[in-house]
């Protein structure tokens, strides 16, 4: 028997006799740009049909807005699907949790009408804790960088992930175990940070007393989420994952170092929830009809002009978490091709198309070029290279009529439909939904 035949037999054997362990799949919603694409609204729309909604990474540096029954909810740690009282919300092991912020968020949204959270929120016992001193260190590190700051949210996310990576972080499960052991670990991690940052001041005894109270408050919510999710999949439960931040903020694939401290791409879903690759079903890339970015870092299609101002004003582009104005620019196809390559989008939700309604013409970035005019066949791997590219634009006619009341794709202006089809054609990924307003009712089903 030849080597190729032998290899073929081995490969065939590899795929024979597979048993279907899971009765359902995990669908994933991911931001395809630099965040603020409208993931929360998409999750809210889909959550009405699922059993479980999960957060897998990040912390309260994320900000999602959901409008339900005329009420606007702001979420930072809670999954956006929590507004659906029929589904369970899971905060996975890959999330870092600042407990004071979590309970503040719960109280604020309960005041707006969020109900019965105690029966449908589950927090992983393996999630790491963010402490106040992490936030102080975050602010100090940003201040030290001066004009070269990264524009972080100063929520302590980076320092908490640093503690996790250096193996001196503290997990939720440890808070709920032997409190004497928790106290020892807490004193140790504080001592380490004070040694590195002598100006921070931590009242250790006061913090321990505070966290003893938090242990009692958080205890009813905490479970082994890995077992919970695998049991749910074996029982055919439908699961939706809400990625925080976005692909271009991913610690590995984003515009490093102007990124967040976790994997906001598809890989972060697996590691942040303890799921194997074969459980993944649909991967929905959420794309804003133009591009925005909060904070510092390269932005090839940014418009520092009247167009940028118009997009910022019409789109109400202010960060949910930071309250900073977002930088605005044209849609960037090379960027989206790159994030689609990394994440494997199976479909797209295009949001905020209505913000472009008043423009007589619309530009779309279709290629990056080197200074010598040569087109790039890859997304630049360094900010130096990205800062040195030239952008080639396609100029499309606008539609100059309101799309806000449109609820059928074929009723959109012809030029608006062409804009959607261009994105579909360039990415070779179907656009399944188009958003033309704030509420969930303003999302058009394309197919």
UniProtKB/Swiss-Prot annotation:
Its cofactor is Mg(2+). CDD domains: AdSS (cd03108). Disruption phenotype: Mutant flies show life span extension and increased activity. Heterozygous mutants show increased ratios of AMP:ATP (3 to 4-fold) and ADP:ATP (2-fold), also observed in response to caloric restriction, and associated with life span extension phenotypes in yeast and worms. InterPro entries: Adenylosuccin_syn_GTP-bd, Adenylosuccin_syn_Lys_AS, Adenylosuccinate_synth_dom1, Adenylosuccinate_synth_dom2, Adenylosuccinate_synth_dom3, Adenylosuccinate_synthetase, P-loop_NTPase. It is found in: Cytoplasm. Mg(2+) binds at residues 36, 63. GO terms for biological process: 'de novo' AMP biosynthetic process; IMP metabolic process. Substrate binds at residues 320-326. Pfam families: Adenylsucc_synt. IMP binds at residues 36-39, 61-64, 153, 167, 245, 260, 324. Its main location: cytoplasm. Transmembrane segments: none annotated. Homodimer. This is Adenylosuccinate synthetase. It comes from Drosophila melanogaster. The gene is Adss.
């Amino acid at each position: 028997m030849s080597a190729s035949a032998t290899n073929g037999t081995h490969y065939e054997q590899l795929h024979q006799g597979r048993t279907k362990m899971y009765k359902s799949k995990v669908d994933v919603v991911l931001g395809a740009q630099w965040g603020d694409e409208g993931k929360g609204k998409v999750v809210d729309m889909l959550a009405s049909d699922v059993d479980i909604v999960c957060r897998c990474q990040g912390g309260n540096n994320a900000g999602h807005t959901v409008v339900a029954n005329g009420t606007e909810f702001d979420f930072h740690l809670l999954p956006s699907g929590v507004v659906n009282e029929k589904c369970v919300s899971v905060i996975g092991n890959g999330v870092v949790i600042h407990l004071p912020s979590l309970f503040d968020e719960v109280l604020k949204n309960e005041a707006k009408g969020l109900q019965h959270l105690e029966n449908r929120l589950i927090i992983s016992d393996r999630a790491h804790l963010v402490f106040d001193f992490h936030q102080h260190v975050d602010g100090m590190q940003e201040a030290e960088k001066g004009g070269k700051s990264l524009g972080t949210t100063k929520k302590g996310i980076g320092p908490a992930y640093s503690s996790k990576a250096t193996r001196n972080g503290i997990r939720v499960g440890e808070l709920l175990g032997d409190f004497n052991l928790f106290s020892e670990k807490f004193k140790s991690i504080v001592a380490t940070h004070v040694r590195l940052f002598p100006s921070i001041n931590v009242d250790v005894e006061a913090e321990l007393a505070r966290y003893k109270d938090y242990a009692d408050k958080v205890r009813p919510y905490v479970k082994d989420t890995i077992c919970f999710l695998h049991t749910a999949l074996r029982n055919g439960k439908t699961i939706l994952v809400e990625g925080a931040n976005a692909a271009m903020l991913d610690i590995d694939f984003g515009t490093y170092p102007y990124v967040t401290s976790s994997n906001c791409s598809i890989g972060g879903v697996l590691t942040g929830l303890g799921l194997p690759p074969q459980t993944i079903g649909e991967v929905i890339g959420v794309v804003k009809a133009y591009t925005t970015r909060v904070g510092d870092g390269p932005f090839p299609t940014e418009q520092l002009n009247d167009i940028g101002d118009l997009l910022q004003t019409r789109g109400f582009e202010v960060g949910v978490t930071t309250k900073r104005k977002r930088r605005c620019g044209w849609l960037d196809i090379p960027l989206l091709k790159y994030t689609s390559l990394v994440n494997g989008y199976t479909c797209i939700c295009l949001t905020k198309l209505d913000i472009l309604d008043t423009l007589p013409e619309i530009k779309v970035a279709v290629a990056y070029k080197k200074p010598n005019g040569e087109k790039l066949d890859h997304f630049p791997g360094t900010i130096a290279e990205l800062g040195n590219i030239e952008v080639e634009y396609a100029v499309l006619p606008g539609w100059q009529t309101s799309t806000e009341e449109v609820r059928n794709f074929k009723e959109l202006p012809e030029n608006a439909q062409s804009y959607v089809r261009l994105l579909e054609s360039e990415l070779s990924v179907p656009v399944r939904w188009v958003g033309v307003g704030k509420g969930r009712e303003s999302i058009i089903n394309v197919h």
